[in-house]
Amino acid sequence: MNLNATILGQALSFILFVWFCMKYIWPPIIFAIETRQKNIEESLISLKKAEEELIIIQKKMNQIIQDSKEKASFIINEANKKKSIILEDAKSIALEESKKIFLRNQLEIDLKVMQVRKNLHKEIVDLSILIAEKIIKDNIQKDQYKYSIKKLIVSLSKDKKLI
């Protein structure tokens, strides 16, 4: 065997093998690699877009949360103001009502005091008349000072009628 022919045969076989691989095997492998690269690039682009959208959505969400907190704070402040106003109104109404009740009770007390004084004065006058009658009956004879006694009784009776 000739060494040159063997090397030439092997070289020719190798060239045919490389040509066959480049013609039929290599293109599908390259196509699969390129497709995979495109998919990876598209995935990376989609990932970047998704991250940007996520950042935008988080900013919007934070803004919405902040707005909600401000609205809640405003509503709470308004409710506290209304509560204060209602409490002040209730206090003033209660104070006015207590003043009315106090004045009404004071008038009732004054009326009762006046009635008691009037009754007491009447009883004092009645007792005075009774005492005077007893003293007069005991100390004065019937005929003596009759005119003075009648005058005293009439004047006391008039005082009693006035009361």
Curated annotation (Swiss-Prot):
GO molecular function terms attached to this record: proton-transporting ATP synthase activity, rotational mechanism; proton-transporting ATPase activity, rotational mechanism
TM helices/strands, residue ranges: 13-33
Listed GO CC annotations: plasma membrane; proton-transporting ATP synthase complex
Pfam families xref list: ATP-synt_B (PF00430)
Membrane topology: Single-pass membrane protein
The UniProt record lists the keyword Transport: yes
CDD domains membership: ATP-synt_Fo_b
Keyword Membrane set for record: yes
Known role: F(1)F(0) ATP synthase produces ATP from ADP in the presence of a proton or sodium gradient. F-type ATPases consist of two structural domains, F(1) containing the extramembraneous catalytic core and F(0) containing the membrane proton channel, linked together by a central stalk and a peripheral stalk. During catalysis, ATP synthesis in the catalytic domain of F(1) is coupled via a rotary mechanism of the central stalk subunits to proton translocation.
Subunit structure and binding partners: F-type ATPases have 2 components, F(1) - the catalytic core - and F(0) - the membrane proton channel. F(1) has five subunits: alpha(3), beta(3), gamma(1), delta(1), epsilon(1). F(0) has three main subunits: a(1), b(2) and c(10-14). The alpha and beta chains form an alternating ring which encloses part of the gamma chain. F(1) is attached to F(0) by a central stalk formed by the gamma and epsilon chains, while a peripheral stalk is formed by the delta and b chains.
Protein name: ATP synthase subunit b
Organism from which the protein derives: Buchnera aphidicola subsp. Schizaphis graminum (strain Sg)
Lineage, highest ranks first: Bacteria, Pseudomonadati, Pseudomonadota, Gammaproteobacteria, Enterobacterales
